[in-house]
């Protein structure tokens, strides 16, 4: 017999609502309701097809099956066609903390809300809400953790979550055998998330702790990614700010074995670190090839196609009696960001990158590296690194906006005396001036003047170029070898310094100069 389409279910529903409202305004304590209303034509006691069905349980419900000590509420409309997938229906569940069903909702709060458009198992075109507490004990993917999902109405696919807001938060106790063992993991997608693969037009943030044990690419290391909204390609990460830091214990069989690796890309340009010649497989876009050249290219009259990167506006340089009272450590990064708030996203990234670089100053090939956070500490670094107080400071004459990649003619190139033992200090992005200083070995410094061979620009004078004389122990994956098509040890490697650097060289004493 087919269920009737009359107003009976609606009338019963309204009667129950009236009873509930009336009970709330009477002196009767703890009203008990256990009401069942079936449409006249209910054909089957199991699947409730083609009928209206309505249950209300209070806390005292003592059924020995699925609904002990809980309130449970179902509302199906007339078109409910299947008890499994609940197509073309409204369905509402609410479980108390005391829910003790042996199935999938043990010891947790679970709230589902489906709108009329719920069509199948992937919950397309619906609102969906999950909340698991830490005691959730399901054998699936949510063991011993807090997990939170929020999908908006535009959710179009349960796999890639396009055009939606999505939020994950895992606590340290996450014990799933998948990709998140013993780690904290945090995702934040904005409304513009359009693709699971490349994450264009979105903010994305990953943080892995040292205990990350996945057999993939992040073994025994700290890894930090930060993408801004302009991220345009998941492969080369051009036009983004991206930050990597690998510990020496990195054990991946790929390109980062047993080394420290530090990359920092600035938005829209291939900025740093062209000076980190011993630090692994640095990936630069094709435009970076003009950063490098050979020492022979510095001969006067030679044609040189090169570029010099832009520099930041200079920040203030503190004295030691001021800087010593300001925390300077990654463990205090929250306090530092608060102290200098409000800070832009770019500055926040720079603070983190600077702190990481200054806390991991281990270099290769005998180089020394230190950071200076004050005028006095910079002088201390210079003296301790070069072993003398007789020093000369040189600053590049490159313009703040840098030098574009064009065809230039070398007007002059003068070697700087004693530059075989030099100290290069690079201005870091920080609320006040911080220098990262290191001592590259076997170098030769040149003061260079260039004349544009294309645009008729005036003479560019006072440039500083460094040539590394021995590249035999450089990493084979360095971009210099890739772009210049040479092998380690075959030739010298040269590049210009940007305006934000200071180069220090020792000055011979009078006695040494007369010998």
Swiss-Prot record:
Please state every residue range assigned to the domain named BURP. Answer: 292-507
The residue range of the signal peptide is 1-29
Q: Which UniProt keywords apply?
A: Glycoprotein, Signal
Q: Which InterPro entries match?
A: BURP (IPR044816), BURP_dom (IPR004873)
* Name of the molecule in the record: BURP domain-containing protein 9
Q: Which organism is it from?
A: Oryza sativa subsp. japonica
Tree of life domain: Eukaryota
Ranges annotated as spanning the membrane: none
Asked whether the UniProt record includes Glycoprotein among its keywords, one would answer yes
Organism classification: Eukaryota, Viridiplantae, Streptophyta, Embryophyta, Tracheophyta
Instruction: Kindly state the tissue distribution recorded for this protein.
Output: Expressed in shoot and panicles.
Q: Name one Pfam family in it.
A: BURP
Query: Where would I find glycosylation on this chain?
Result: 321, 332, 470
């Amino acid at each position: 017999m087919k269920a009737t389409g009359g107003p009976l279910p609606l009338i019963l529903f309204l009667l129950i609502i009236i009873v509930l409202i009336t009970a709330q305004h009477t002196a009767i304590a703890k009203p008990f309701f256990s009401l069942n209303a079936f449409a006249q034509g209910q054909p089957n006691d199991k699947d409730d097809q083609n009928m209206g069905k309505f249950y209300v349980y209070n806390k005292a419900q003592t059924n020995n099956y699925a609904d002990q000590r809980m309130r449970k509420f179902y509302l199906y409309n007339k078109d409910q066609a299947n008890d499994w997938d609940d197509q073309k229906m409204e369905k509402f569940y609410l479980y108390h903390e005391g829910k003790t069903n042996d199935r999938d909702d043990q010891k947790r709060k679970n709230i589902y809300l489906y709108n009329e458009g719920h069509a199948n198992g992937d919950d397309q075109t619906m609102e969906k809400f999950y909340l698991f507490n830490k005691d959730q004990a399901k054998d699936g993917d949510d063991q011993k953790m807090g997990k939170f999902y929020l999908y908006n109405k535009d959710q179009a696919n349960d796999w890639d979550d396009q055009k939606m807001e999505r939020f994950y938060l895992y606590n340290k106790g996450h014990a799933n055998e998948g990709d998140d063992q013993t780690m904290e993991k945090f995702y934040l997608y904005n409304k513009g998330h359009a693709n699971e693969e490349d994450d264009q037009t979105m903010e994305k943030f990953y943080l892995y702790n040292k205990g990350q044990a996945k057999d993939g690419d992040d073994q025994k290391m700290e890894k930090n990614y930060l993408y801004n909204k302009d991220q345009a390609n998941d492969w080369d990460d051009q036009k983004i700010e991206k930050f990597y830091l690998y510990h020496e214990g990195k054990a991946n069989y790929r390109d980062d074995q047993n080394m420290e690796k530090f990359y920092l890309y600035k938005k829209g340009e291939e900025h740093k670190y062209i000076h980190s010649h011993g630090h692994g497989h640095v990936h630069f876009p094709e435009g970076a090839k003009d950063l490098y050249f050979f020492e022979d290219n510095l001969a006067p009259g030679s044609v040189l196609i090169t570029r010099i990167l832009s520099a930041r506006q200079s920040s203030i340089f503190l004295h030691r009696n001021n800087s010593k009272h300001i925390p300077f450590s990654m463990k205090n990064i929250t306090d530092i960001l608060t102290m200098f708030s409000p800070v832009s996203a770019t500055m926040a990234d720079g603070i983190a990158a600077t702190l990481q670089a200054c806390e991991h100053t281990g270099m290769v090939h005998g180089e020394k590296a230190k950071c200076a956070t004050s005028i006095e500490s910079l002088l201390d670094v210079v003296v301790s690194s070069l072993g003398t107080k007789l020093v000369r400071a040189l600053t590049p004459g490159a313009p703040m906006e840098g030098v574009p990649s064009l065809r230039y003619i070398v007007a002059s190139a003068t070697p700087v005396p004693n530059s075989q033992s030099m100290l290069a200090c690079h201005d870091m992005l920080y609320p006040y001036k911080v220098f990262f200083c290191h001592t590259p070995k076997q170098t030769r410094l040149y003061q260079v003047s260039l004349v544009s061979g294309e645009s008729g620009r005036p003479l560019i004078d006072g440039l500083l170029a460094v040539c590394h004389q021995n590249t035999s122990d450089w990493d084979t994956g360095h971009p210099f070898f890739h772009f210049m098509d040479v092998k380690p040890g075959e030739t010298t490697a040269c590049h210009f310094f940007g305006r934000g650097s200071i180069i220090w060289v020792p000055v011979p004493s009078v006695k040494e100069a007369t010998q």
